[in-house]
Amino acid sequence: VEEFADKPGVIGFTVTSTRYKPVHANEYMRLYSMIEETGKPIAFHAGYHWQDPSLATCNSFLGMHALGFAWCNIVHMTNWVLNGIPERFPKLKSVWIESGLSWIPFVMQRLDDQYLMRMSEAPLLKQMPSDYMRQNCWYTCQPMEKSSEVGLKATFEMINAKTQLLYASDWPHFDFDAPRVIAEIPWIDEE
């Protein structure tokens, strides 16, 4: 951060899927503070590997690809919010990349539900987990899951897509999103 924050073209910092320490480990707090001071976001880029014990029982690329990218960010988001990172670093923007969008409403609802029963396990929170996810987090469209227009519309509403959705292509991967992926959604206006 110290070396690159002021370099031309640096617009933020990316963390690939962590496989060593969770995102709430104290070792990262200085890093989060430094990134927050730059005013630039931290981005979590989803990624999976076949050796992840929680995904090792998937026996096809289809299953692993469908679950793996979302699973990484589900775990990171859960730890990010419940451990009060948005409270500790209120000006730190987080971006959640390449895990699609459909997992977000599930995590919002599930965390809110569980939080209401166990608030003592998340003592740093001053609002509902979903509120942090709607206000302090941005999400990339890639891959845009368009198989259910009803589901996508509900997701857009829940994440406050008008302000929190970012375009990402993931070119040249096979499942990249061309710009039209957003432009062709019939209920989205030019704004």
Predicted regions, residues:
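Active-site gating/metal-coordination segments in enzymes
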Residues: 1-76, 83
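H/E-rich (His + Asp/Glu) clusters that bind or coordinate divalent metals
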Residues: 46, 52, 58-84, 88, ...
